[in-house]
Amino acid sequence: MTVQLTDEAYAVLEGRHADPFHYLGPHSEDNRVVVRALLPDATAVEAVGEHGETAHLERVHESGLFAGSLPNGSHRYQLRARFGDTTVDLEDPYRFPPILTDFDLYLLGEGTDQRLYDKLGAHPMALEGVNGVAFVVLAPNARRVSVVGDFNFWNPRRHQMRVRGNGYWELFVPGAAAGDHYKFDVVGPHGEQLPQKSDPMAFAAELRPKTASIVVDQTRLPQPRPAPAQINALGAPMSIYEVHLGSWRRKDGEQWLSYRELAETLPAYVREMGFTHVEFLPVSEHPFDGSWGYQPTGLYAPTSRFGTPEDFCALIDAFHAQGIGVLLDWVPGHFPDDPHGLGHFDGTALYEHANPLQGRHLDWGTLIYNYGRTEVVNFLVSNALFWLERYGIDGLRVDAVASMLYLDYSRPADGWVPNKFGGRENIEAIDFLRRFNAEVFAKFPHVTTAAEESTAWPQVSRPVEFGGLGFGYKWNMGWMHDTLNYISKDPIHRKFHHGQILFGLHYAFSENFILPLSHDEVVHGKRSILGRMPGDEWQRFANLRAYYAFMFAHPGKKLMFMGSEFGQEREWNHDRSLDWHLLDTPKYAGIQALVRDLNRLYRTLPALHQLDCDPFGFEWLVTDDADRNVFAWMRKGDDPRARCLVIANFSPNVYEDYRVRVPFPGRWREALNSDSAVYGGSNVGNAGEVHTLDGLVPELSLTIPPLAAIFLTPED
């Protein structure tokens, strides 16, 4: 047949047609079905109808454009193409119907599709009985988008996509399958060729430095068993073990453990140590090891460093089998500007702000999400819901919330753009955080969220309907800074800083707080937690034991970074395993034993956890003994008899006959003494119990051990 090439044909050949379906594939013309196919490397092509009818497709352009016709009604056919000496039967991607429905497009345009991960990305499926993969990507300003991969020899002319409403490009690729590697080849709005892009919605990716996305069949992922239903309840104990999966342990020198290898040891260790939760530093795919995961390029993909999505499911399941909740560090505040990532995705600032005063972090050299764009907010909120639903995650800790809330965060006076009211609050980010929390808790009421927020922003952990940001918890950065500053001082100087211990209780119940001794406190020259302790060797370890005991007795949930539980000496290094050999030395094993027992006590004594976030759960008893560095307080539970008396002595002196008033007469049992010889201490104490003195007011006469804290509970 004679084919006159039109402008539309050249638009397809030159890769600038927004809807190649309008030209390629089957088209009814003059009682025939005209078939056009673009197969750049083919030497001959036939169309074979479903009833066996065939038509020779003539090469009408040297770039591989073929055209011919079948009898009317032959819209289902295959292409029989010869490549050199090989002949293969191919399904024509341009004969299949659209993937996205009109309702899908409506929700996508409105930004209210909570299951974006069911629509966008790469999804293995059968369409009209043909197996393949449906690819959908957002690129509203692109002139052309092609999907390239293992299935088309990475040729961008083979599978040009069509644009639908609101800038979503789609294509069903017959024969593509789970495990295939792919990217999007994008031509920008001015005809410029962009770097090939990874899929923003990819469920897996190649190991760095490679950057291709990998097709995953999400419907075949095993569903981890659920964690205990009330594990995140406000009145339940919450003690979190923060872990960087790549450096907890290593094998054969310096090789990572896989997700499945970690599943064999890490959950059992966390359980043995008495922690209720584990929190992973970000597991989303990221190109740079040294970012620790905080500069992600693949928010929907568990990093391939440690295995596949199926392997990651196995790790979550192993934790849930031990009754341990799993929290993820989640990074919706910024992303790196790697060429294959989200930055300048369609040739414009699609995910980020175009103005660098709004769109770039000066400190980190990363790009900031544009929370004023509905597609971006939908992308992020759907990502949160994705982890909770598909992997059964029990909560999300949101990184760097302060950097999201303030437009002038870490910027010079002339380096930021005020909001519409002239203020520095990022109104769009506030709305995003509220929507994120509202949708998470509406769909998953038993999970939790936590904010790393380092300023005094009010009502971070108050419900959205009451004007708050809606988080379940907020990290208590003020407590962490004040108490670490206090404990790092020589005991002789601590009396001048007595208020650093007291001050935290002035605001301890203004939020639902987590007390964080996180990874940020053991890097960048800050030294390890043990490394901050003053004095000789005995005092350093005693100080650390006293500090940990103080932390577990203080109101608020607990978080401890890996290695701190046994007194790691070195700063954390993401390229090395923790120094597990230290546990061969009794003083480090003693620290580990103390943390294990503190976790046990915290979990089993209602007074230590039931009212963690309620002022009725705490009462100061001794606040004015600065000269002796002694504090005493009472922790309370729901039951009037649920009481725990705590005395902390941050001096190296022993105090005999130390008087403390208590609410009940009778015997008080010494539930824990951080100076016990079991933990490496001097074994000064009260022989396990003490009786109240005779008198009108119940009072205890105690022996207070040096650099230690003791816990006493009333006998029934």
Swiss-Prot record:
It comes from the Bacteria. It catalyses: Transfers a segment of a (1->4)-alpha-D-glucan chain to a primary hydroxy group in a similar glucan chain. It is an enzyme of class 2 (transferase). It holds the Pfam family CBM_48. The active site is at D399 (nucleophile), E452 (proton donor). GO terms for cellular component: cytosol. Its EC number is 2.4.1.18. GO terms for molecular function: 1,4-alpha-glucan branching enzyme activity; cation binding; hydrolase activity, hydrolyzing O-glycosyl compounds. GO terms for biological process: glycogen biosynthetic process. Disulfide bonds: none annotated. Catalyzes the formation of the alpha-1,6-glucosidic linkages in glycogen by scission of a 1,4-alpha-linked oligosaccharide from growing alpha-1,4-glucan chains and the subsequent attachment of the oligosaccharide to the alpha-1,6 position. Monomer. Belongs to the glycosyl hydrolase 13 family. GlgB subfamily. This is 1,4-alpha-glucan branching enzyme GlgB.
